[in-house]
Each structure stands twice: as C-alpha cells, then as structure tokens.
Design a protein with these regions (language model features):
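Short glycine/acidic-rich loop motifs that flank beta-strands on beta-rich extracellular proteins
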Residues: 41, 55-57, 83, 89-97, ...
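Short "repeat-start/strand-capping" segments in structured domains, especially the N-termini
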Residues: 74-76, 113, 144-148, 166-171, ...
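Leucine-rich solenoid repeat scaffolds
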Residues: 310-351
Length: 351
C-alpha cells in the first residue's frame, strides 16, 4: 500500500463497499471504478478475500455483441494484495455469457489507457452459459493503450480468458491461465487462453511473455486479424510472443491468423492437440527457438482451418521456421509446408 501511494492515490476497496460477505460486489466495484476515474485516476487496492460477482444478477448488454458486469475506465488500475488469495469469483448462469471487466472504444467513445491489472485471481469456474459465444471472458477490452496485465491467475473462463483487442504499448506478463475457453467446442469463436484481435492501427505493438496457458480451448495464445470477418487484410505490425509455456490445449498452442512482422520465440509447447499455427495470409512471421513436443496433430501447420470464413485460404508469405526443436509429435511435422520461405537449423527427434 505505502509503495503504491507514492505514485498514485490508492483506494482500498473494502472502504468503498466491497466485502467477501456480499452476495454480489458488482455494483460496489463499478461505483468505485467510476469514482476513481472521475477523480483523475488511481489504484483500486483489493485485499485478500473471495469477492462474489453474480453474472445472472448484474450482467448488462454493452453492445449487441458484448455483455458486461463491470465497465473499466481509463487511469484506473486494479491491484490485489495476493495473487492467489485475492479472488474475484464470478458465479451465475447467463444465456450467452458475460465478461467481468469490459471496455469498448466505440461504446465509450475513447481509447482505454493507463489501466493496469495486477496480482489477483479471477475464477469463473461457477459461471455458466446456455449458448456458447465469445462473451464469457475475464477481460474483454477493445481499443487500449499503455496498459499492463501482470501476475494474474485466470481460471476456467467459459470463453477466452484474456480477450483484449486492438492494443498499442501493452505488456502481458506472467499471467497464468487454466481452462481458458472451458465451454469452447470446435467451430466456435474465441475460446483461447490469451486472444488478441488486431487491426485498428498500422502498428499494434505489444509483448506476451512469461505466461502459462494450460488446458485451453481453441488456442493457448491466439492473434487474429479482425479483417477476416469483413474480407479485409488489416495486418498491423510488431508483436512479440516469447518465453511462454502452453500445454494440454484442445486445439493448437499458438496461432497467428493474419498479421505482419510477428516474432514467436523461445516458447515451450507440449502435449497439445497441435503446436504452431498460421493462416489467413499472415506474412513476415518468424518462429525461432521454440520447443514443440508431443502434438497429436501437426507440430507446425500453415492454414487449413475455417476456410469457409471469407476466403481463409489466403496464402501466407515469408514464414520462417528456424532453430526450433520438434520432439515426438505423432502426426505431421508440417502441413502445406511449400509456403514456408525458410526452414533451417531445426532439430527433429522421433517424429
């Protein structure tokens, strides 16, 4: 607390109505977020405890595609007292799912900025939906700058756990995700551990590092150009996915759908249905120094998923696969490998 207070005004959430004894803390937290934002910004400090958020009671439709519990505002940071013992627990049944923290730049008429989330757990294992959609996330932001997501645990989200789109100068660091996309089935949208939609700016610079994604649905980590839904190629430049662990995912570990100038390096990927994946005309993508082990499908795949979506068969360009290690992958090492521009100095064992 004292260290935080040197930089920004700190609001102890307990002093503003949040309480582990409450049956629903949604209204109290939203009121506090609004207060901090209107006062010029600061830190909401959440002490140790389990805080309930009732999605059945407190969800509301932000847009026709987004159902929210709390709306995040600029210059408001959330920091917990304990990574494992400050728990925001979402419960309740909704028709299509709802997200605990939402922001949409078209709805709010502003880009979200300076909103850090750090050192707490979001547990959605008791939140359910009747019809699977992409809505049931821990974080659901669109249009954000200058934000940090660090030291978080995101548990059993029905849809993507950290589903944040259109990022610039954003760091995602040391986030543990278990069962992101718990309710996802093949053919559904979203359902990843970390899912980043791209395509608002020419340069969308962000880093995903030191994260652990376990038993996720569609992908462990997934970058997706949103032009695919409008038959366009936006392909913003400049992302890094590095030093992450992805295991036991039901589809592929790391996927790049569209995009330009992406570095995927030094990731430890094992026991997934598939390893690395690119499609929708992605270009200038470098996969370097990754370990891909015990994939049930391809350890590396170029573009054969969902071709019915606006010509997803667009050919990828300048895909580089170098310095990776492939171990005991059961089926294909490569699919459509003729599109690779460079394959060199990879290690292959017992494939």
């Amino acid at each position: 607390m004292n260290k935080l207070e040197k930089n920004k005004k700190v609001y102890n959430a307990i002093d503003y109505g949040l309480n582990p004894k409450n049956k629903d803390n949604s209204e109290e937290l939203q009121t506090l977020i609004n207060l901090v934002h209107n006062n010029g910004g600061g830190v909401i400090f959440i002490p140790i405890g389990v805080y309930i958020f009732d999605s059945a009671k407190s969800s509301w439709d932000m847009t026709k595609n987004i159902t929210a519990i709390c709306e995040m505002k600029s210059n408001v940071s959330l920091i917990g007292e304990s990574l494992t013992d400050t728990i925001l627990k979402v419960i309740g049944n909704t028709e299509k799912g709802s997200a605990l923290f939402c922001h949409n730049s078209e709805f709010s008429k502003e880009i979200l900025h300076s909103a850090t989330a750090k050192n707490f757990t979001i547990d959605m294992s008791e939140a359910s939906l009747n019809q699977y959609t992409h809505r049931g996330k821990a974080f659901y932001y669109s249009g954000i700058k200058d934000c940090v997501f660090r030291d978080l645990r995101l548990i059993s989200t029905p849809s993507t756990a950290l589903g944040i789109d259109m990022l610039d100068n954003v760091v995602i660091d040391s986030v543990y995700i278990y069962e992101g996309g718990r309710s996802w089935n093949y053919g559904g949208n979203g359902g990843a551990g970390i899912g980043i939609g791209t395509g608002l700016w020419e340069n969308e610079n962000y880093v995903i590092r030191n994260c652990i994604c376990v038993s996720c649905g569609h992908f462990g980590i997934f970058l997706e150009d949103q032009g695919i839904f409008h038959n366009k190629e936006n392909f913003p430049k400049g992302q890094i996915i590095s030093n992450n662990i992805v295991r036991n995912c039901r589809h592929y570990a790391i996927g790049i759908r569209g995009g330009d100038t992406v570095l995927v390096s030094a990731n430890n990927i094992y026991n997934n249905n598939g390893g690395l994946y690119v499609d929708y005309g992605a270009r200038n993508i470098i996969f370097n120094g990754n370990i891909i082990k015990s994939s049930k499908e391809a350890a590396f795949c170029i573009g054969n998923e969902d071709k019915i979506i606006n010509n997803n068969s667009k050919e990828c360009e300048n895909i580089v696969l170098t310095g990776n290690t492939f171990i005991e992958n059961k089926i294909n090492l490569l699919k459509d490998s003729e599109h690779l521009s460079c394959i060199e100095k990879n290690n292959i064992f017992i494939n």
